[in-house]
Amino acid sequence: MIPKYRVWAKIGKRMVFSDDLLDIDYENKEIVTQQVYFENGLPDDRDIYCYDFDDIEFMQSTGLKDKNGKEIFEGDIVDYKGRKAVIKWHGSYASFIYIFVDELQKRVAGWSPLYLAYFHFEVIGNKFETPEFLEVEE
């Protein structure tokens, strides 16, 4: 599987998807992206942006899709049977996991491997564009 990424650009506060990611320069620690503008359904113009690694957040695709066929990325917030959960990478287990939002504030939050329940998930946002979903309702 070829890794697929999306990038949150802190400057400009915009999500860049892999189709618009032109280059990842590991030596200079920067990426080059494009924003394509369409007119009448056809590409009309584009802007090119360069971001330092310090100004972006990489999010890798899990390779899985939610119940509506939407690709699930690290950092996504999902609805799972009426509870919100956030998707994270667990380095020790080399696996994507989900943690319920209402457990994030606990000292020891429970987590589960993503592959066990992803087919019940519905992606409802992500930690950058919809951070309010990470707030615990009391």
Predicted regions located by residue number:
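Secondary-structure transition motif
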Residues: 1-138
